[in-house]
């Protein structure tokens, strides 16, 4: 979204079966939390995790953090019951795993009419159908599942994420075309701060709203990288001031630091300031 009322710089996965982790998450500096009932939960823990998470969301105080529940797929024995369990709950979003077509979104939309839906984009077919998926009227966000996508592609890890570039780009284009939030995939080496920072910067520069994270130790870097810097805020203010001054003199462009500033640059500048304001408001809550 161009002007989000809520930041999604850091989106932390928490296993729905881990009571201590659910409790600890109330005090973490995450913009949003994905409470995971899918990959992070063993088969024999699925029902327990669902019940525990439902009760936890009713009683725990997660503040203004967006509460996202990743349910099991509708082709599993748990998926439909997962969705039913969080209808009318305090979940802000239902995250649908392994979305390959808009039909997968509709299958969940039919079960839960009043909760926003996000799609995990993690299959090869999902990449090819990204525009169709993003166009679904109930969808408000996408999450890149880069581990599963790499598995399907049989690709190897590279710091430049060469094999994933096409998929990342297709989903980003689809999300922006339809006004969706879109969050980058995880960085697995949670002790590698330099690698995490580089991948966050790559995702930020591509245009992602934030990054999914697997460990609380990754929060600080993600929050920093996906926040406008003081220099970016200062430049945005100067661009807006210069452009408004130019308009008062009947001119359609301004010059700031030797560079032309047109209306499109002002749109970006206002987006930068809006994001900074949203982050400040979130931090003050």
Swiss-Prot record:
Q: Could you give a single Gene Ontology term from the biological process aspect?
A: oxaloacetate metabolic process
Its keywords, alphabetically, are: Hydrolase, Magnesium, Metal-binding
Q: Which reaction does it catalyse?
A: (S)-malyl-CoA + H2O = (S)-malate + CoA + H(+)
The cross-references to InterPro entries, in alphabetical order and at most eight, read: Aldolase/citrate-lyase_domain, Citrate_lyase_beta/mcl1/mcl2, Pyrv/PenolPyrv_kinase-like_dom, Pyrv_kinase-like_dom_sf
State its Enzyme Commission number(s).
Answer: 3.1.2.30
Give the quaternary structure.
Answer: Homodimer or homotrimer.
Give the protein's recorded name: (3S)-malyl-CoA thioesterase
Which organism is the protein's source?
Answer: Cereibacter sphaeroides (strain ATCC 17025 / ATH 2.4.3)
This chain is encoded by the gene named mcl2
